[in-house]
Amino acid sequence: MVPKFYKLSNGFKIPSIALGTYDIPRSQTAEIVYEGVKCGYRHFDTAVLYGNEKEVGDGIIKWLNEDPGNHKREEIFYTTKLWNSQNGYKRAKAAIRQCLNEVSGLQYIDLLLIHSPLEGSKLRLETWRAMQEAVDEGLVKSIGVSNYGKKHIDELLNWPELKHKPVVNQIEISPWIMRQELADYCKSKGLVVEAFAPLCHGYKMTNPDLLKVCKEVDRNPGQVLIRWSLQHGYLPLPKTKTVKRLEGNLAAYNFELSDEQMKFLDHPDAYEPTDWECTDAP
């Protein structure tokens, strides 16, 4: 059994699968998100970079307004991320307000992340100061990081002004880029590991090892990859532009991979990122 929710270090619950919304055309985003909520998704991941925060919010709000008596805001977990150009105290303060304005009907942001460590130590920590204030002001419930390596996490955890610890680190993880040392380190420091690009942007869907396991468990490659992530204790963020695949991806909760199948899929020595790499940034 894998849990439907993880408990964050600050006490909040986070659904253990999120619908990733990167590269979904803006014109389709609200409908995909709305259909996602209808079929059971409760966690949605976007970013300033994606240019679709408003549309993600619109899809959620459409569902909330459909049946206000039964559809509650507290059921939804909404994540967004500050882009590199918004790093720095003043810029981050303004950007956080803008992020909330994009989804004002949601009233608050469940999780706000720094999208990457690329802007350097000074701006990273200034941004964190602004994010901590957003928590204190009730604009944001939880804060975290993305694409952070061990040294970036240590920098933050050892910062004398740290008041609100990061609750997650969102990094690319799949059987072909396992980052075991970093993932274990995050967990040891109380950070939930969110796995972006858990489906490898589709590049591995015909991989023979993956297809062998798919045949054994009678599931499709996407479901097996999501399940692999869950059984490692990660929080996968699968994306789809196809409504009919939404429900199928959630079916990853409904079967189990054996220890042998998990080990067969693991490629601990592989390093095949399908997205940007900045966990090693200065």
UniProtKB/Swiss-Prot annotation:
Its GO CC terms are: cytoplasm; cytosol; nucleus
Residues noted as binding substrate in the record, renumbered to the chain: H115
Top-level taxon:
Eukaryota
Site positions for Lowers pKa of active site Tyr, renumbered to this chain? Answer: K81
For this protein, the record's InterPro entries field holds: AKR, Aldo/ket_reductase_CS, NADP_OxRdtase_dom, NADP_OxRdtase_dom_sf
UniProt keyword list: Oxidoreductase
EC annotation from Swiss-Prot or TrEMBL: 1.-.-.-
Show the active-site residues.
Answer: Y50 (proton donor)
Q: Does the keyword tRNA processing apply?
A: no
GO biological process entries: arabinose catabolic process; cellular response to oxidative stress; D-xylose catabolic process
An example of a GO molecular function for this protein is: aldo-keto reductase (NADPH) activity
Further remarks about this protein from its record: Present with 6960 molecules/cell in log phase SD medium.
Q: By its UniProt entry, which PANTHER family does this protein fall under?
A: 2,5-DIKETO-D-GLUCONIC ACID REDUCTASE (PTHR43827), ALDO_KETO REDUCTASE FAMILY PROTEIN (PTHR43827:SF13)
Would you identify the family this protein belongs to, as annotated?
Belongs to the aldo/keto reductase family.
Task: State what protein this is by name.
Answer: Uncharacterized oxidoreductase YJR096W
Species of provenance? Saccharomyces cerevisiae (strain ATCC 204508 / S288c) (Baker's yeast)
